[in-house]
Amino acid sequence: AKDVSEFDTLDELKADIKKKLTEQAEAAADNEVENSLNNSIIDKLEGEIPEVMYENRITEMVRDWEFRNRYQGITVKDYLKYTGATMEQFRDNFREAATKQIKLRLALEKIAQYENIEAAEEEIAKHYADLAEEHKMEVEKVKNIISVEALSEDIKVEKAFNFVKDNAEIAS
C-alpha cells in the first residue's frame, strides 16, 4: 500500500477509499434531493412570467459563457463559426436552464416574503467578505459591484431554499 499511496497499510487505504465513496454517495443523494426540491418548488409556481425576464437571464448566461471561455481564446463568434449555429440557436441552448432558474428564484423570493425571511447585517457582511476572498478583491470593490439590496435578496433566497429543505418531507 505504501508503494502506491500515501497510506502505510492496505487497511488504511481501504478505509480511505470507503470513506471517499461514502462521501460521494452522500453528495449525490443531497444533489438529487435538492434537484427534486427545486422541481417541486418550480411546479408549484403559478402566474405569468414576462418573457423579458427569461431573455435577460439568457443574456447573463451567454455573458457568463463568454467569460469562462475567454481564457481558452474562444469567443461566441468563434463558437458560432465552428458549430455553424446561429446566435438564436446558441441562446436557445440556455433557455431551459434560464426558465428553471427564473421560476425557482421567483418562487423562493415569494417564500422568503411569506415567511418573513430577512438577511441580517452580519450575514451580508460575511457574504461580502466571502466574495472578496473568493475573487481576491477588496471588500469595498465587491460592494461597488454588488449592491446591498442584490446581495440581501440572494441571501433571502438561499435562506428560503434552506427553509423549504428543512421542512420538506423527503421519502427515501
Model regions and ranges:
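Extended, charged alpha-helical "arm"/coiled-coil substrate-binding scaffolds
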Residues: 1-172
